[in-house]
Each structure stands twice: as structure tokens, then as C-alpha cells.
């Protein structure tokens, strides 16, 4: 970047730890760039307003929501409107259009909200839960010959680290 701070969301994403939504927020607030953000609060607001019922756990559906979020962005006077629009969406999701008990009667966009019109705004966004992972304890055996070679074996295909080469292991019962 030749000593210059990035000025676009695309450039900001090249910095370590800056993802798409954070980069968009910075670009919107600081430079008035017309770019959508999609943090958790904004996802909740947009899926409810649009009655977007596609499962956001599927990347194609998340891409579609990004596209719709972009379509809804202001188009004029961007240096002033983009920071206000972005902050407004974030605040709406954090304070009124909350996850557990949305306060629809206080919402400034209730007349536009298709989720409210369904009578079930709380069912949005749709995101299937990931499977809960169980904890396993393993003891690894380290066996080394005098010449420095180590005993390794190919793990069975199903299961954790399937078909990988590893030290022999034993499952340990957890109490």
C-alpha cells in the first residue's frame, strides 16, 4: 500500500484480521464508500425486512443476502448517507430488532417489514445449527528407534484425522 492507509473495502480486506463486513464498515464510515455490511445485527434486520427464509448456513444463500444488501444501499450523497445508513442498520439490529424479543412496535421500518407481516419475525434469520462436537481424549504413543525413526501408522478412514499418518493412539475414557 506504499505507506497509504487503504481507502476501499477491497483494499482493507487485505489487512490481517479485517474481514468483508469490517472492511465495508470502515470504508462506509470513513470514506462514504457504497458497500454493504453484513454483521450479525444487519443480517437479522435484513432477513426480517425481506422475509428472507433461505438458510444462511449455506454459502449460496449468504451470497444472495449480500447481493440484496447491496441493492438496498443509498445511491446519492454517499459521504453523508453511507455512514448514517450503515450505523442505523447496525443500531437497529442491536437495540430494536434483537434476536430474542424484537420490539417491532418501536421499529422505524415496521411498515416495510415482511417478517413482521408473517406474524413471526423471530423466525428470521434461518440458520441451521452446526453439529455439536464431542470431546475426545487420546493418548499418543511415541516410539523411537536408536536410528531416530519413529513409529507411525495410517489412521482408519472414518473418524477424526481419517486416513492420515500419525503416531499410534489410544482412546482415553473421560469421567
Stretches found by the model and what they are:
Residues 1-105, 109-122:
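Catalytic cores of DNA base-excision repair glycosylases
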Residues 91-175:
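Intrinsically disordered, low-complexity, charged terminal extensions of DNA damage-control enzymes
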Amino acid at each position: 500500500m506504499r505507506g497509504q492507509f487503504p481507502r476501499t473495502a477491497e483494499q482493507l480486506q487485505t489487512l490481517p484480521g479485517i474481514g468483508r463486513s469490517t472492511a465495508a464498515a470502515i470504508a462506509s464510515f470513513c470514506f462514504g464508500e457504497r458497500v454493504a455490511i453484513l454483521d450479525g445485527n444487519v443480517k437479522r434486520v435484513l432477513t426480517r425486512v425481506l422475509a428472507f427464509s433461505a438458510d444462511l448456513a449455506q454459502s449460496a444463500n449468504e451470497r444472495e443476502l449480500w447481493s440484496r444488501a447491496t441493492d438496498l444501499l443509498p445511491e446519492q450523497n454517499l459521504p453523508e448517507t453511507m455512514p448514517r445508513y450503515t450505523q442505523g442498520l447496525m443500531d437497529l439490529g442491536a437495540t430494536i430488532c434483537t434476536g430474542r424479543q424484537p420490539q417491532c412496535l418501536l421499529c422505524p421500518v415496521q411498515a416495510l417489514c415482511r417478517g413482521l407481516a408473517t406474524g413471526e419475525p423471530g423466525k428470521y434469520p434461518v440458520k441451521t445449527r452446526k453439529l455439536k462436537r464431542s470431546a475426545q481424549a487420546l493418548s499418543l504413543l511415541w516410539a523411537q528407534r536408536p536410528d531416530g525413526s519413529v513409529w507411525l501408522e495410517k489412521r482408519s478412514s472414518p473418524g477424526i484425522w481419517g486416513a492420515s499418518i500419525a503416531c499410534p493412539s489410544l482412546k482415553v475414557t473421560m469421567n
